């Protein structure tokens, strides 16, 4: 099989013809049966020469410059990767500090510093096998052998049979809470049970007479202990209060409500500055006298003006 090799030359290699010949002789010694193509790298990058992809088994790059001038553009690395076949090798004067760029473009860095284009790895999907459920009492497939309900001849469950099994399943039953409460009340009335066991309570049910009596007694205790502020409403406070004389009611009203005058006196005693009420000035006798004087003065001026006109006319 003929090995196709591309000899890629840097433009500055023309200054050393012996270098190119030595590389060619080395290639001939290593690969007796080969086909060699020689190109200048600038002609490939500029598009003057178009090479086919996946064509060359090896590419030898010759760059006689120093190591600091061996840098390759990313597009050139990608182009060389496209020209190589799978398991193709790029050898020669390669930059040592661009191994990461080569990896990003699909190369694998070899032990000798060469860049290798690996074969694409085929993705293999492992499919899990379905487990066949065989719920039969006998290993053979005789029709006369007993089978469970819901299993066909192949030993698999059927949809219709599964729905039949679901319909035959017993639904759990729950006892109503109302019946339980009535049962507890009956036991308490008969004296068979001392106290009901703790359980769920129905908050939507109406309060019993016993609960109402307990609530009234609690309200009375609150009134007696002067804790009426914790009652539900003002009407509840009045229900537990005894009827007293009118004098007591008046005294309680005085304790509850405060007079406006008392409030003002307390503010004055606290040395608070109360702004003075704004009042409009009232017209007095002095103001009327001033207006009268102005009117008299105007009349005199008018008379003098009339006399002056008559004299001048």
Swiss-Prot record:
Identify the stretch(es) annotated as Disordered: 134-155, 187-254, 271-313
Which residue intervals are annotated with compositional bias (Acidic residues) in the record?
233-254
- Taking the first listed entry, what is the main subcellular location of this protein, grouped into a coarse class? cytoplasm
Give the matching InterPro entries: Dre2_N
Biased amino acid composition, Polar residues: 189-207
Q: Which UniProt keywords apply?
A: Cytoplasm, Iron, Iron-sulfur, Metal-binding, Mitochondrion
Composition-biased stretches, type Low complexity, lie in 134-144
Where do the segments described as N-terminal SAM-like domain lie? 1-184
According to the record, the residues making up region (Linker) are 185-270
Q: Where in the cell is it found?
A: Cytoplasm; Mitochondrion intermembrane space
Which Gene Ontology cellular-component terms appear in the entry?
mitochondrial intermembrane space
The task this protein performs is described as: Component of the cytosolic iron-sulfur (Fe-S) protein assembly (CIA) machinery required for the maturation of extramitochondrial Fe-S proteins. Part of an electron transfer chain functioning in an early step of cytosolic Fe-S biogenesis, facilitating the de novo assembly of a [4Fe-4S] cluster on the scaffold complex CFD1-NBP35. Electrons are transferred to DRE2 from NADPH via the FAD- and FMN-containing protein TAH18.
How the protein assembles, per its UniProt entry? Monomer. Interacts with TAH18. Interacts with MIA40.
Q: What is this protein called?
A: Fe-S cluster assembly protein DRE2
Species this protein is from: Lodderomyces elongisporus (strain ATCC 11503 / CBS 2605 / JCM 1781 / NBRC 1676 / NRRL YB-4239)
Q: Which gene encodes it?
A: DRE2
């Amino acid at each position: 099989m003929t090995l196709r090799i591309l000899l890629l030359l840097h433009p500055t290699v023309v200054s050393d013809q012996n270098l190119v010949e030595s590389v060619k002789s080395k290639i001939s010694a290593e690969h007796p049966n080969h086909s060699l193509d020689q190109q200048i790298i600038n002609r490939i990058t500029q598009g003057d020469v178009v090479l086919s992809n996946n064509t060359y088994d090896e590419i030898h790059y010759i760059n006689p410059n120093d190591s600091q001038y061996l840098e390759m553009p990313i597009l050139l690395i990608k182009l060389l990767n496209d020209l190589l076949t799978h398991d193709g090798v790029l050898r020669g004067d390669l930059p040592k500090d661009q191994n990461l760029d080569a990896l990003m473009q699909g190369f694998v860095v070899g032990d000798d510093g060469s860049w290798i284009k690996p074969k694409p790895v085929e993705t293999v999907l492992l499919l899990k096998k379905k487990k066949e459920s065989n719920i039969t009492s006998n290993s053979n497939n005789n029709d006369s052998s007993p089978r469970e309900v819901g299993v066909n001849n192949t030993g698999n469950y059927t949809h219709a049979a599964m729905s039949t099994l679901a319909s035959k399943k017993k639904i759990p039953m729950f006892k109503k809470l109302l019946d339980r409460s009535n049962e507890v009340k009956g036991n308490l009335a008969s004296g068979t049970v001392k106290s009901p066991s703790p359980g769920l309570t129905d908050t939507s049910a109406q309060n019993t007479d016993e609960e109402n009596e307990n609530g009234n007694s609690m309200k009375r205790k609150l009134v007696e202990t002067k804790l009426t502020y914790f009652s539900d409403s003002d009407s509840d406070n009045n229900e537990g209060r005894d009827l007293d004389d009118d004098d007591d009611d008046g005294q309680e009203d005085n304790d509850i409500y405060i007079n406006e005058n008392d409030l003002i006196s307390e503010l004055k005693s606290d040395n608070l500055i109360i702004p003075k009420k704004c009042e409009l000035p009232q017209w007095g006798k002095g103001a009327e006298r001033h207006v009268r004087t102005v009117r008299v003065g105007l009349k005199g001026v008018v008379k003098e003006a009339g006399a002056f006109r008559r004299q001048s006319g």
